[in-house]
Amino acid sequence: MKLIYTEMSYSMTEILVNEARKAADQGYRVFYIAPNSLSFEKEREVLTLLPERGTFSIIVTRFVQMSRYFTVESSPSKQHLDDTTLAMIFYRALMQLKPEDLPSYGRLQNNSVFIEQLVELYKELKNAQLSVHDLTGLDHPQKQEDLIKIIELAETIMIQQDYNQDSPLQSFARAIKLGLLNNQLSKTVVVIDGFSRFSAEEDYLLSLLNNNCQEVIIGSYVSQKAYQKSFIKGNIYEASLHFLQDLAQKYHIKPVFATSNQVFKPAFSRLTQLFEATHDFSQVDWQLQKNDLDHFSLWQCHHQKEEIEHVAKSIRQKLYEGYRYKDILVLLGDMDAYQLQIGPIFDKFEIPYYLGKAEPMAAHPLVQFIESLERSQRYNWRREDILNMLKSGLFGCFDDSDIDRFEEYTQFADIKGFTKFSKPFTINSSRQYPLDFLNEMRQDIVLPLQELFKSQKQLGASLVDKLILFLKKIRLAENMQGLAQSQLEVEKNEEVWKRFTDILTSFHHIFGQEKLRLSDCLALIKTGMKSAQYRVVPATLDVVTIKSYDLVQPHSKPFVYAIGLTQSHFPKQIHHSGLLSDQERARINEIRNYRHFDIASAENSKKNHQTALSLFNAATKELVLSVPTVINETFDDLSPYLKELINFGLPLLDKGKNYLSYDNSDIGNYKALLSQIIAINRQDLIEMSDQDKMFWTVVLRYLRKQLRKQQLELPTSDYRLSTKPLSKEVIEVCFPKGIPLKLSATALTVFYNNQYNYFLKYVLNLNKTESIHPDSRIHGQYLHRVFERLMKDHTQEPFDNKLKQAIYHTNQESFFQQVYQDNAEAEYSLAILEDIVRSTAPILQLNQNIKVIDQEKNFHLDMGNEILVHGIIDRIDQLSDGSLGVVDYKSSANQFDIGTFYNGLSPQLVTYLAALKQIAPHDINQLFGAMYLHLQDPKLDLVTFKQIDNTLVESIYKALTYKGIFSEVEKEHLSTGAYQTKNALYSNDELETLLNYNKYLYLKAVKHIKKGHFLINPYTSDGKTVQGDQLKAITRFEADLDMAQARRLVTLPAKEKKECFLTLMRKESHL
């Protein structure tokens, strides 16, 4: 064995490549070994240093891959054991044990996290060269007993299923020990680069290679100053020194110092010496030179997004200077925090990149499909799971529009559970859903699922066969091929599909002869899919490499950007979590020689120093170290290592916000420039954060309150929300000439409430999501129907019998049966409605002097060539003198207010009067009024009554009265009925004024509507608060900011209010 060390200013790779070349020139086969995380970059670096740029004599690889070169022909043809397969084996082993067999872990048998921990422990035991029987000295002896039972049973299953329990390194070591590879190894030289420690498995293999290979050469970075130190605790080279010293002591060899021809920039060497002096308690009498600072930059940004954008702009600048993407390395302090953000930002700046991390499959549509399938079976056809299956794009041949239509209907009809999905869809609504098409789609969905889900407990092999048949029926493979939109997505889908088929194969192999329920089968496949990962190799080498900073090696790239270096992540504090604590691992390690667990927490200090040293020397030209103030929405401090650099004289540059400018870095890229233009256009919207906007909004409210106290006014802000008029072509289509515009009293109210709301409802025809569950609209229909039946019954039956019959027959109608007999909640609503009917009906019994002329009367009121008003009158009554009136049933309290009517917000009763006047017989000229009847179950506060007597009954009937507009001429006839006429009597001239002004409101609205320009103008009654529909989610209307756009209602003092409004009406309607 040969041990080599060198200073950070030299290239250890060049030194080791020269050693490898010498051995190759002598005819030896050379294996150049690098850590798993660095083998790809190391191979490129080694081949670059070779004069011939390539050779068959030097193989750059990893320990595991090296073993395959020697054992590929002699390896037994056994099944491969990966993490997913291991998890399934442990699951099968736990299935065969009873909870009482495992005192410590019996309750965790079906826990997926526990199974994952078992897999990790088993792999650790293999790497540590330990067996489960070596787990002595645990905190609780029962833990070892349980683990022995589980792992031994799992190993028995592995033997039965012909799985290879040995790792590749164990197989390699066994072959060496048996002498099967002596001839090959005698002609082999092993060069090891980039290691600062070996696992027990690697350590054992190394001892065998040292005894059988021609030579083993190991290199590491250690300064001569550190090598000569007797006390190395806390030294930045502590990890490498321990590494070399342990090897030197074990193999009785002295490390030698070497240098390379390539010497890196002195600035990095001087920074390293300062860093070393800080940690070995020595002093230097010099500082960094001014030109040294050109090679280092310390950035501080507010948050991650700004930090990544600054890096992207700097990379674009480097390209402008002539460098290439492959010259740049980006290191992340926290992979999870940056992984989701860095991709879109680099895409915006058109920077190709390769993220050196395996991607989890959890977000792939195939995994979402499998998860939805499993949940559909477990939760009995829950609607959300069925829809998620369809939306994955992997189920059947359905367009997105078909899935949207199916989703809309299932939400409307509340389809959930197997019972409802299995029955034909029969319920429809005013939207007239295409039930024939939806039922065909339902069958295409239900039949294959039903065939699969009816599977009983059976052999795993049979379940897999049925699952595969199901996947063929729904064309999963064909749909999977259609998902990809680019070559990269094709490659990703191929990797995911390969992992999926491997999982199915493993399941078939392990559980083929075991009886399982379908739910267990799907759960196991889902767990395997969610925990699986895949990796895609970049299509070109000219990309920016992105990886975690703790995987970096010295002198990696000319330009290195390390971001996210906060105190929480640099240095990293690794704490092991698993079935064994670090204390238990340490006790086991004290007993065993050459076989040991890796205890990450014990290595934190020296490993972090080694990582920081490698990071500070990662670049050969320029190193940028960046830290955000806020990471993952949490404030964080500077890393202690960065604070040391600041003490060395490196300035901390506050990059601040990404201010828009005309610099080359801002406008030098097309896609980035487009993004900047959009940002400039919206600059007034993004100048403040949401928190800042909230603060200043509250401040503005407070300021206005104080100004009002001092009788001062704050100028109202200008209009910020504007709408565009419709084009002439759209106006011609929506409002064709010669055809009157159809309006209703409700539509007119919506228009005067907020013009934009009218545009959404009656021009775009946008509707809220419907539901079969009864709402206020359906409740109103029910009450209307009961009273319609009741008033049509002219038999001599007692009134109570008539009421019972009306309720009974209404309840028997198919629509109301579907609505109110669907569940207990709907039945409870029906019971409340019946109580309301019984409470309100007596008012009809009391008014025996009226005659019901008509009910549910449709009308079309002609107001000229441009408008046609339509609607339905609930009831037309006739008094004993022949005069007619209109009754409108309401499920909530309503009362006619002349001010509200004047402002266009309550035209219903006057519109019904106008319609009644038009449709009334010619011999009837008198109208007695239009009124609301509040259908209610009156609530009384008994505390206000001294005793229960007639006053209580009178109060109930007082609440059940007609309220509205009444003719003064019919005052005598109305006094005997339940009519509230106080402040509600109008003369015939005044009624005529109301009718004329009502027509004026309609004509005014039609004129504005046909212009095609709808304002965002919800009404305000006091100029301080907005009562109209603001539609905030669509219009972004804010009362404090947009009060100038609100329509101010005309309000008058209560005294002579009626006369004043009538005067205004006559004036405006030109009467």
Swiss-Prot record:
Keyword annotations from UniProtKB, A to Z: ATP-binding, DNA damage, DNA repair, DNA-binding, Exonuclease, Helicase, Hydrolase, Nuclease, Nucleotide-binding
InterPro entries noted in UniProt: ADDB_N, DNA_helicase_suRexB, P-loop_NTPase, PDDEXK-like_dom_sf, PDDEXK_AddAB-type, Restrct_endonuc-II-like
Highest taxon in the source lineage: Bacteria
Cofactor(s) needed for function: Mg(2+)
EC number: 3.1.-.-
SUPFAM superfamilies, sorted: P-loop containing nucleoside triphosphate hydrolases, Restriction endonuclease-like
UniProt subunit comment: Heterodimer of AddA and RexB.
Family: Belongs to the helicase family. AddB/RexB type 2 subfamily.
Function of the protein: The heterodimer acts as both an ATP-dependent DNA helicase and an ATP-dependent, dual-direction single-stranded exonuclease. Recognizes the chi site generating a DNA molecule suitable for the initiation of homologous recombination. This subunit has 5' -> 3' nuclease activity but not helicase activity.
NCBIfam families, per database record: rexB_recomb
Any further remark recorded for this protein: Despite having helicase-like domains, this subunit does not have helicase activity.
Protein name stated in the entry: ATP-dependent helicase/deoxyribonuclease subunit B
